[in-house]
Amino acid sequence: METQVIDTVNEFLKVDSLDEAFVSVIVFKPNTEQERATRFANDLVTAFGNVAQENREQVLRLYLLRAAGASGYHIKVLMAALVKLVDAHVITARMLCDKVLMCEKLDFEHRTFWIESFRLIKRVIVQVDYKGVREIMKVCRDKAQWFPLNVNVTYMPQLLAVEDILRFIFDRNNCLLPAYFIANEIMRPFPYHWKLNRLMTDFVEEFRTTAQMVSIIGHASMLPIVEHFGYADHMMNSWRLDHNTLKFNFKGSLPYEPELLEEQKPLLRYVLEQPYSREMVSQMLNLQKHQKQRYNALEEQLVNLIVQAMEMTEANDATAGSGFNSSDEQITPYEWMWLHLSSQLIYFVLFQFVSFMHIVLALHEKLSKLELRKGRDQLMWILLQFISGSIQKNPITNFLPVFRLFDLLYPELEPLKLPDINKSSMVRHMAPICVWIHLMKKARVENMNITRPLPIALKNHYDFLQHLVTANTMMNMTLGNDFRIILICNAYSTNQEYFGRPMGLLLDALNGTSKSPNGGQIPAVTFSVTVLDSLTVHSKMSLIHSFVTQMLKQAQSKGQVPAAALLETYARLLVYTEIESLGIKGFLSQLMPTVFKNHAWAMLHTLMEMFSYRLHHVPTHYRVQLLSLLHSLSSVPQTNKMQLNLCFESTALRLITSIGSAEFQPQFSRYFNDKSPGAVASNESEELNRVLILTLARSMHVHGGGDEMQGWCKDFLSNIIQHTPHSWPMHSLACFPPALNEYFTQNNQPPENKQQLKKAVEEEYRTWTSMTNENDIIAHFLRPTTNPLFLCLLFKIIWETENISPVAYKILEGISARALSTHLRKFCDYLVAEVASSSDGRDFIHKCVDTINNMIWKFNVVTIDRVVLCLALRTHEGNEAQVCFLIIQLLLLKASELRNRVQEFCKDNNPDHWKQSNWQDKHLSFHQKYPEKFALDESASQIPLPVYFSNVCLRFLPVLDVVVHRFIELTITNVHQILGFILDHLSILYKFHDRPITYLYNTLHYYERILRDRPALKKKLVGAITSAFSEIRPPNWSVSEPYKVYLQSQDSLWTPELSYYMSLIRRLADTISGKNVFYSTDWRFNEFPNAPTHALYVTCVELLGLPVAPPLVASNLIDVIVSGYAVIPQKDIHSYINAVGIVLAALPEPYWSGIYDRLQDMLNTPNMLNWTYRFNAFELFNFKTVREAMLEKTYAVVLAVAHSVFHHMGAFKLAAMTRYLKEKLKPCVRTEQQLLYLCHVFGPFLQRIELEKPNAVAGIAVLLYEILEIVDKHHGPKPLQYMDQICDFLYHIKYIHVGNIIKNESEAIIKRLRPLLQMRLRFITHLNLEDIHTEKINDNTSNNAITSQTQSPMQTQHQQQPQQPHQQQQQQQQQQQQQQQQQQQQQQMQQQQINAVQTTSVPLGSGGNLQQQQQINQQQQMYMQHMQQHQHMQNMRHN
């Protein structure tokens, strides 16, 4: 059968001998050749039909080879005949196109076959599915690359043939495949042949609009707030960079703006500059600790930061330093930069993310081109940090490049002067010689002969050190008040011959065992931060190792507790992140368990105190780990002592309340992957579990996620309810996020019957009075089955007798500390029930409070902090709740004991413990004046544990936090007045709060709904807490000057002008840019890890504290950019927009929802409803365009602010976009411009939403189709101006984000759209052309005219094919038909372009000038027709 096809071809190509002989005189009939060609085509169809299906590809290949060898006329006939095979369904159009393009003879040198091949493809490609068209287009694109750049004019027709088929495919009106696919393919292999470059680039340029709709305005200028918490993956999606290129990771190939495709070096450098940023850097770049991979981009930025620090140092004089135990060293910003860089360098080199050797080489290369000398010692100091700690474990070859830095940085021919040994700057100046000594020692150990001489500049330094380590000098050395011993430790930390003696002296000084020259005992000395900063990392590690070793020995021997100076110094050492493995990690994993194992209760108590009151910026996972450890330790019988148990609970309370809102959910869910949910919840303490739930509620509210309950959270809550069943009052549930509210509403425990409780207490009291035998009394009340009502009974005894009998003492001693908590809960319930039901009123409640105060202060039965915490967390409704709060007020304020202690403690003490050397002396004197007892009789069985860092005031502080919150929840005026009284007397205690601004932020955020209508209470809260620091902080440390004036005024109302909001945003923007707007502080001991974080939280506190409605505050913040655009320096505009986004995203929903209100206003502007601008929508929505061309800016500026807000939002807040789009913005949309504006709003965040909330993207996509249908119907018969851009965006969503998830929903809507939209979107639903045409005729006959005017060539071909039977076609008719179709296609394109002006790739300002655009299009069409006619004439002459 295969030979039949070839025979048919040969028969057609055979030339009769007579014809050949008389060719010059024979006259042929007019239609002979056409009839012959028709017969051949029919015979070919018959012959091919007889070929087996599996052999047709091979036969077709042979046919094409035979055709390629024919003459010009015969090639045309042979190729044209192949169309018949496709029309007759003998072969598929896809197979034909593939075989033609793969034909070995297809070469542009073979002109006729090349041209006819591409003409053939053009004729049949309309019958190829879009995937096949995509592959054909790629092959055609690649074939064009065969032509040389300096192509000969004789090859131009062949190149034009390729261009013609590509133009045909690219023509959107033909709808052969989604234009999105075309752009995706042609963007990758640039550049193209110059003849096609215009075609390709013009098509790609059309997708600038799609790229604009999915690009964040000012993305490259956005900067984050770097907090120290453990980052969850979804919190970093906004800031992720490719770790090799430092570029943003965009989905899809689109022509984004150049700045979005550049390396984001400023972003990484900014983050690296921030203290406590290493975790964010690791998440940004997706650094994997276990892979030990070197990241060149990170390495380069570290080098740049070091060079920048040297430049900063060059512009400033060298620091003089501070004395040995200076309490408050003034460190300049650039010196902080060096301290921070040292920590960063060690971390990234330690985990092998960067190479130390390559960093040194890069530094040498950069510094060799610069004249920087002032910072050379600082550079050597940070190199010394790493060298001293790692040189013993690494070969000397890794450090040899450092010698090149010596040659470069120390070229002096005279020795440098020795620095002042009494100043801390001395250790920096001596760092070069310390580095030299470490390197030379390592070389000797490895037997490497380094002949390099000592730099002359360092000769004096070397001689001085050599003198210090002589035997005589070492033996007579004492610590003194200079830095010589520190220097020896730094220089010889790897040389045990010289290192042991100075390290021993440091330990002796801390332990108080040092001797003066005359033999006297020297008191223990706490090392200042200045001294610790002067030690290298290796020396710090050795020191902390010595501390831990000593404490472990003391724990094993149950000996004395370490000296206070040593513990204070140990706590200060734990703040250094570069020694984390030996520091906080060793503290939790080694020291604490060993101390507990050896039952060294005094040391355990002291270590927990130290953790509570001395440690800062402890990573969250360590705090969760300690919380779990505390719960496991507290369940051991040996720890069931009053003072130790109180310390456990107090430490756990501080741990729980200190967990940040953004930290709680990711850290706990991660922790529960390995541990049971009960690991961080208490099995016995209802109060701790209640605070844990309140902290979870706050986290859900502030950070988001309160609308749905995650799996780990349900397990966590059910575990709590199982071990400590409890209920919540309605006023607390009202503040809970919806998910928590629903959970506790369903799982609420029934309240205890108060009458039964009172009856049980009366029975116990009768039992007490009726029994006379002491042993019987003790046995009865210590029996496990007895109700835990002894504190209730004791209350009645003291009420009656004002004394406690010895029997009661013995019973209390028999009740364990944890069991006493159960008694306390019953007592609190009983107390409230008694007062609430009493008819005696004021006298009764006062006597009750006096009795409780006696129990607390006189008889030491319970402590004030435990009683108040328990009372505050009990579940009471209505009148009982008010009674409970009244009791709390009287407990705190009626008696003077607590108030006196608070006033005395706050007057004589300063919370900046790291600046003090005499904290212990002051604290000891306070305890002597106000001694604390933790038992009725501190006998031998209850030996008091030493107290170094805590007291009743500090323990009460987290309880006061809880009390304030509980008072706010009960929205009754007199309750809030009581809170005001409490703050008046006790707010001074907030001076010692380690997170006062964070506490204010959380309070104002969580209770925003309640406080919104209570400006006086907000003012009271902010004023009371911030004023507590008035004596120890500079005036500008927190709130702004105008707000401070408001706090000091009597009026509770104030409506600030726009300039006020502008100043707040300027302050934040300046801080982020690096200006020192606030006070200088040591961020290692601060509430916040860096200045921008501090600036954000104080700004939010101030805005939340304003007596202004949230929508008005939000509107003013947006107007800072919209109305203040003209007065903001243009170089700073993006930093201001970034700052507004940061602030709004950090405020509660009533504030950040204001951006949706403003977007709604934009959609409803008259010009959106009736576009009258002469600029098209994409121009006016482009921030860069309106800024540079000075056009109407409102739309673009509001978009920029919205993008900034959404970019800084967390995942849960961003996911609310679907709801706001549906409820607030969708009802406004009627026009194309509104639809495009809406696409600009959510388009840039689809990628993030897909990562964080995958199902949400599908919901947004369905909304978009619904809005498109509304717009389509609203426009009626009028053509859509932006149809192609909208379709491109829909294809982007389908192929990048949703796939076929919404296929059914989208298909139903697309079928209801106008035919032109259906045509363009048919690849989303796979609609047939017949369905599109037929459905629309049935649907709306009025659209027939539009359909006929805008019908595409593909539709025309499809409709004409049935009208002309293939058996009657002649060759001439085919040519005429083809020409007619081309002319019709040109006319249709011209008509369609007139009807719907394309906005893609049009000049600025052309959007409104339709007449001018039509003239341009007509001229372009005339030129195209002329070129096609010229090409046709050339082809005819050639043939």
Swiss-Prot record:
Molecular functions (GO terms): transcription coregulator activity
Superkingdom assignment: Eukaryota
Gene Ontology cellular component terms for the protein in this record: mediator complex; transcription regulator complex
Keywords carried by this UniProt record: Activator, Coiled coil, Nucleus, Transcription, Transcription regulation
Known role: Component of the Mediator complex, a coactivator involved in the regulated transcription of nearly all RNA polymerase II-dependent genes. Mediator functions as a bridge to convey information from gene-specific regulatory proteins to the basal RNA polymerase II transcription machinery. Mediator is recruited to promoters by direct interactions with regulatory proteins and serves as a scaffold for the assembly of a functional preinitiation complex with RNA polymerase II and the general transcription factors. Required for transcriptional activation in response to heat shock.
Family to which this protein belongs: Belongs to the Mediator complex subunit 23 family.
Protein name per UniProt: Mediator of RNA polymerase II transcription subunit 23
Organism: Drosophila melanogaster (Fruit fly)
